[in-house]
């Protein structure tokens, strides 16, 4: 009886791994911008309550007259427009532009590129130097108030796995 149970558990775990591999393959078949949008949608979630964010994490800017009861289609449009604007800031980084765009959607471009308040991140410094060993520096963007947040680390890992340019 125990042997049968072990065999069933083994087969079920194998089926689960196969389904996960198929899902990963399907995700990689999508265009990179759609992969980026799906990752953001998954981890950001839908913002419909109070606060400065609406849709899939769009921050309402001064002068924008948007309400919190927008449709999912409007939320998608805002997401793609935000990604386009951020991508324009990073397009000089070649293959890394989309990865940096998705990161900046969550942390803001100033924390990556630097400005008067922040110095350029180690991640952007390595990319500018042409170094490829950026995984740990990318995953280090998982802190909030100095603490590592597991859900953010999981998000960074997913972003890196699906958007890091394979060379």
What feature does the model see in each segment?
Residues 6-15:
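Sec-dependent N-terminal signal peptides
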Residues 17-21:
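Sec/Tat signal peptide C-region and signal peptidase I cleavage site
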Residues 87, 91-97:
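Short, solvent-exposed, charged loop/turn and helix-capping segments
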Residues 97-111:
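Short N-proximal segments of mature Sec-exported proteins
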Residues 1-3:
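N-terminal secretory signal peptides that target proteins for export/translocation
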Residues 11, 22-50, 58-64, 70-89, ...:
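Long, amphipathic alpha-helical surface segments
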């Amino acid at each position: 009886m125990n042997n049968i149970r072990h065999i069933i558990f083994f087969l079920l775990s194998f089926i689960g791994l196969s389904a996960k591999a198929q899902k990963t393959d399907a995700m990689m078949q999508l265009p990179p911008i759609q992969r980026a949008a799906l990752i953001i949608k998954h981890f950001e979630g839908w913002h419909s309550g109070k606060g400065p964010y609406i849709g899939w994490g769009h921050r309402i800017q001064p002068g924008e007259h948007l309400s919190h009861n927008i449709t999912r289609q409007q939320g998608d449009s805002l997401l793609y427009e935000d990604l386009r604007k951020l991508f324009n800031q990073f397009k000089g980084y070649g293959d890394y532009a989309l990865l940096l765009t998705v990161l900046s959607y969550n942390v803001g471009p100033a924390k990556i590129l630097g400005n008067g308040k922040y110095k350029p991140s180690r991640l952007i410094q390595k990319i500018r130097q042409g170094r490829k060993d950026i995984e740990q520096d990318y995953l280090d963007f998982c802190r909030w108030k100095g603490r590592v947040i597991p859900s953010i680390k999981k998000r960074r890992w997913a972003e890196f796995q699906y958007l890091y340019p394979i060379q």
